[in-house]
A protein has these predicted regions:
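Aromatic- and Lys/Arg-enriched surface recognition patch
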Residues: 105
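Short, charged beta-turn/beta-strand-edge "cap" motif at the junction between a beta-strand
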Residues: 77-79
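Bacterial Sec-dependent N-terminal signal peptides
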Residues: 1-6, 11-40
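Extracellular beta-rich repeat passengers
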Residues: 27-54, 58-65, 69-70, 81-93, ...
Length: 389
């Protein structure tokens, strides 16, 4: 009996050791050399997990390559100090997991003493979902990574409670980073509770793909607060945008594709519960040169419901024949409230430059529309984890 018990005990210990080894194998460590004071390089394998008690100085490009994962725990701070060269990019087949919380968001910000939009690049994610450039794949305008494909449910990870501040550094003569750029990102990716704050270009931009989003805040970005092109077709809920800092353009700039207005798949997002607050209809025409809440052009479709628009020269600004033809069957806003100071609720311009009646783009108005949740005010879901509102 004693011998049998000893044998059973030995087998139990061996089994436990084997299980532990198997679990370790599932979470294989990476060969990446993690240096917090010089955070850059190529994550080519395994999983790199950051430490929330450490501040990471992003001095150059950090690229997560196919098969690798970058995991960022709640409360982690990453400071960009490398200007244009400092950005985080996620390659096709790689993943980023941002595990922030309302109390402890992950913060990607400027490491400069005096912080300004454009102090560092931003976050770039490349997926395998469809685009409409006429080729199955393409190279991202920032980072140069490949994006696009045929995988609508492609998964690039999970992003929750993330704040991106002072991004938008110039990448080339005519290209700038956005706060968060989605290149062909699929709807297997989770994006919830993200703020883009005071970047020098767009807050969020979607280049094709099918990614869905919830609870996005774009505040004080110096170009458009939201932008899409190349056939993006995500489903979205709760967007809040507000211009600030004395400079900016549209609430939304929306294209199908600049060089093929009818290219398929056609951009066709659905957005429910959105507030767009502008600089005022009489704002300075130099610093706020494109004073429209929604610029819908180049063949885009879209459906917008429960929308609050305030303080813009133009509300729904529809341009190009293909876009106008989509009104109101495939391009429309319902339950819209022009809360204050929107002298031109709609405006239309054909491709030849002549005017068009696009009043039908607003299919219904609602005096009780709440937009992102609280009319023009900060929605409650943005409490605690956002800044500037």
């Amino acid at each position: 009996m004693k011998t049998t018990l000893r044998n059973v005990f030995a087998l139990t210990v061996m089994a436990a050791a084997f299980t532990a080894c198997s679990d370790d194998d599932k979470k294989a460590s990476s060969s990446f050399e993690l240096i917090p004071s010089a955070f850059e390089g190529d994550i080519e394998d395994g999983e790199v997990v950051l430490d929330a008690n450490t501040t990471y100085k992003l001095v150059g490009p950090l690229v997560v390559h196919t098969g690798a994962t970058l995991t960022i725990p709640a409360g982690t701070v990453i400071e960009g100090v490398g200007g244009t060269g400092a950005y985080i990019a996620v390659e096709q087949g790689a993943k980023i997991n941002v595990n922030g919380t309302e109390a402890k968001p992950v913060i990607m910000t400027s490491g400069n003493t005096t912080k300004n939009g454009g102090d560092w690049g931003g976050l770039v994610i490349c997926g395998k979902a469809p685009i409409n450039r006429g080729t199955v794949t393409a190279q991202a305008e920032v980072s140069g990574l490949t994006y696009g494909g045929t995988v609508t449910n492609d998964n690039s990870g999970v992003i929750r409670f993330l704040r991106i501040e002072y991004a938008g550094a110039t990448y080339s003569a005519d290209k700038e980073f956005n706060g968060l750029s989605f290149f062909g990102v699929g709807n297997g990716t989770v994006v919830e509770n993200v703020q883009a704050f005071h970047g020098s270009d767009d807050g969020f931009e979607f280049f094709g793909g099918t990614v869905n989003t919830k609870n996005l805040v774009s505040f004080g970005n110096e170009d458009d607060q939201f932008d899409w092109t190349e056939g993006w077709s995500g489903t979205n809920e709760n967007w809040y945008a507000k211009l600030s800092f004395g400079k900016g353009n549209r609430g939304i700039e929306a294209d199908n594709y600049e060089f093929g207005y009818a290219n398929t798949p056609i951009s066709n997002p659905t957005i429910k519960n959105m507030t767009l607050v502008g600089p005022g209809s009489a704002a300075d025409g130099t610093n706020f040169a494109e004073n429209s809440a929604l610029k819908l052009r180049r063949g885009t479709y879209g459906s917008f419901d429960n929308i609050v628009v305030a303080n813009w020269k133009v509300g729904f600004d529809v341009e190009n024949d293909e876009t106008i033809a989509a009104v109101p069957s495939k391009l429309k806003g319902s339950n819209v409230l022009f809360a204050s100071d929107v002298p031109a609720e709609t405006k239309g311009k054909k491709t030849d430059g002549t005017t068009a009646d696009v009043a039908g783009v607003v299919t219904s108005k609602s005096a009780t529309a709440t937009g992102a949740g609280a009319g023009v005010a900060k929605p409650t879901w943005a409490n605690n984890w956002t800044t500037g509102l």
